[in-house]
Structure formats: structure tokens, C-alpha cells
Amino acid sequence: TEQNIGGAGGFSLGVKTSVLGGGDYTWMMDDDTIPSPKALEALMQTATQSNDIGFVCSKVLWTDNTLHPRNIPGGLKKDTIENNGITACRCEVCTFVSVLVSSRAVYKVGLPIKEFFIWFDDIEYTLRITKAGFKNYYTEQSIVVHKTPDVYDPNIEQAPVNMAKRFYYQTRNTCYFKHREQPNKLLFRLSIWNKLRILKRRINRRKDGHKQEFLDAVKKGCHDGLTFYPKIEYLPL
């Protein structure tokens, strides 16, 4: 698009275009993901076993061929399935670095939240699919390489100043998630206050002269997160 809609907006638009175009599945990847030749085949072998499967994600390596710590699925279980030599185990949440999502799941739970702009859209979306009752899987036989500059996420104590804005989105988006999962308004506000307190403490450990930029970002993120409640877009059946 001509407008910068962020990673979240791009994923949301991509899924929408794929599903409305008649696709049964959408393979979501970061722009720095390099799939192995049989990565998609392993995903499809798993995803097509049942209509109850919402998504299947890949094993993600870093450029040195070690497991990428940012992209290990959450909620892994010993419950496994097998098809044509491809084995997969249950999981609950994953990143968008390489995940195959069924259109059935998209029609039921809606699109990824484009208003997130960046960060946490993948965790929110895959957990939404899991909570809708779909069975989701991780297969180590679908392998991709995630060519990030560093193997770990930049933390707020050391991140360069040009990333301060990203921590605004991270803070605001996680506040939204807490709001959705915690219906008690008092407990929700207490959790946001505690989050801000922890972030301030971490920012104060910075060794450079850019503490204020990060403090401003997370304060605004917590403030906006109190009222940030975007509507989920559903596709017409």
C-alpha cells in the first residue's frame, strides 16, 4: 500500500486478500523469512488432516542454524499427529514468521488486528484461534530461517533510540490484551500501573542519554492502552 500500515496491517490485509480470493489456507511469513524447499509441504501435510486444525507453524532457525529463541511456539503439548512421515505436536500460540492459517479459522475468529501496527499481533491472533476451539500444531519438518540481525529481541534497557516508538506499540498492545483478558476494571488498571512501574525501573538502567524517549513511549503506551480497544474485522461468509 502507499500508506505505511505496519507489519500488523500488512498481515491483516494479506490474510483478507488471500481468503476472499478463495484460498483455503494462507501462509504467513515475515519478509526476512527464508523457507526450506519442503517447508510448505510439511505444513500442508499437517493442516489438511482435519477441519479442526486452525494453524500449523514451522521450526524456525537463525542464520547459524540454531533454534531461533524468538520463534519457539508456546503451549507445546505431547499430543501428536502424523501424516506421510510428517509429525506434528499441539501448540497454542506462535509468531507470524512462518505459519499456515486455515480460512475456516479466519472466517470464525476474524482478521489479525491491523491497528496493532507492529508487535504482539501474532501472539494475540494465534491465541484467539486456539481459544475458538481449533487444534493447532507445530511441525519440526517444516523448516525456515529467520534472518534477523540479532538472535534476541532488543530489550528496553539497550535498544537504540530509534526503537523507542516500537516500545510504545508493544506497551499499548499488551495493555489491550490484558484489558480483554481481565474484565475487572480495578485489577486491569492495577496491572497497568504495575507494568509501568517495572518498565520505568528497566529504562532507568540505560547507560545512554535516551531514557526520556523510552519513558515517554511507555507512559503514552500505558495511557493509550486504557482506552485502546479496536474492533475485530470479520469477513463475510
Q: What feature does the model see in each segment?
A:
Residues E82-V101:
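A recurrent flexible, glycine/aromatic-enriched loop bordering the glycosyltransferase active site
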